[in-house]
């Protein structure tokens, strides 16, 4: 697979010109809106000054009018500032989507990216890790990739439950000497898992489900309730690799087959993957060779929302870091597929 050095060489030769042209188009829209806002504020200021000149006495009415105009001027200035700030973030987001897709195009001609699409709930449920009967599921940034005839997909995932909350509003009526209490009911979202779902196939076929669940104090302490929402089945299996047992709990109904699947080579590959992407992960090895990896606190959305300082130009370092994060995802398939 092409690496960061190849991409930066491509950037210097061709891509810089292509990206700069796309950024310039968005810049024109931003500065056009900025000019309109500046013109509006100048007009407000001129009207403000003229009113002071025309009604420049010291009457209470005039002072009140000036005060109200000052509030109006400050309010419009604040609103316009927020509008511009939101537009800057939106432009940064749009540029990052362009960069994301251009990096995918550089790495492969066979990919699909749909920003507002999630993995079908039926396919997600088939991995059998989280219990979707009691969890709500949302997803976005669906990406399917084919590199060297190896197909895999990933998308952002949010799994959450809700609980009813009650907000009380109290009002005391002195005339009737009565305390009125109104209860407002609303649902509070409780996130259980937020991260990336990654699905691929490995050459080594499995005969039964095997689950790897993170096994350390921090995971249990921070997500002590997550086990209530995991629906995997099987018996806990102790492997001969003590270090691996300390990292992951292994569950399966077939101890012999799970030991065959989790060979020393595959465990080394999982350790290599953990070094590449340090976020905690849940692994599901299915019977047909499919593997589902749930990577906690890692999303494409966070990557796309990172501000890129487009007004001063997209730096080579920013592009290199962006490329690394995407190539790490695409290398998961390369690392984990044991021949």
Region spans (language model):
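Transmembrane-cytosolic junction motif
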Residues: 31, 74-99
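Membrane-interface amphipathic/juxtamembrane segments adjacent to transmembrane helices
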Residues: 6-12, 87-108, 112
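Mixed-charge, low-complexity intrinsically disordered segments
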Residues: 162-188
């Amino acid at each position: 697979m092409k690496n960061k050095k190849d991409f930066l060489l491509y950037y210097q030769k061709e891509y810089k010109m292509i990206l700069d042209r796309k950024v310039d188009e968005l810049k024109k829209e931003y500065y056009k809106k900025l000019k309109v806002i500046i013109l509006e504020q100048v007009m407000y200021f001129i009207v403000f000054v003229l009113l002071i000149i025309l009604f420049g006495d010291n009457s209470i009415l005039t002072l009140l009018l000036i005060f109200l105009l000052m509030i109006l001027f400050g309010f419009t200035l604040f609103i316009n500032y927020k509008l511009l700030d939101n537009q800057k973030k939106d432009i940064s987001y749009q540029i990052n989507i362009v960069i994301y897709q251009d990096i995918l195009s550089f790495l492969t001609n066979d990919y699909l990216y749909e920003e507002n699409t999630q993995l079908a709930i039926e396919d997600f449920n088939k991995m059998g890790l989280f219990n979707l009967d009691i969890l709500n599921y949302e997803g976005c940034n669906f990406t399917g990739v084919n590199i060297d005839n190896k197909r895999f997909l990933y998308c952002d995932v949010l799994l959450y439950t809700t609980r009813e909350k009650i907000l009380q509003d109290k009002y005391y009526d002195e005339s009737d000497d009565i305390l009125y209490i109104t209860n407002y009911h609303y649902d509070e979202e409780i996130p259980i898992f937020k991260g990336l779902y990654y699905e691929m196939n490995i050459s080594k076929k499995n005969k039964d489900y095997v689950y790897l669940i993170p096994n350390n104090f921090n995971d249990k302490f921070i997500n002590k309730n997550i086990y209530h929402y995991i629906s995997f089945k099987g018996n806990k299996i102790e492997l001969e690799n003590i270090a691996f047992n300390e990292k992951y709990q292994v569950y399966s109904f077939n101890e012999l087959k799970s030991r065959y699947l989790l060979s020393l080579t595959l465990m080394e590959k999982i350790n290599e993957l953990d070094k590449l992407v340090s976020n905690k992960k849940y692994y599901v090895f299915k019977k047909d060779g499919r593997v589902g990896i749930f990577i906690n606190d890692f999303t494409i959305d966070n990557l796309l929302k990172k501000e890129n300082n487009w007004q001063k130009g997209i730096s080579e370092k920013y592009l290199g870091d962006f490329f690394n994060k995407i190539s790490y995802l695409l290398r998961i398939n390369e690392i984990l597929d044991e021949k």
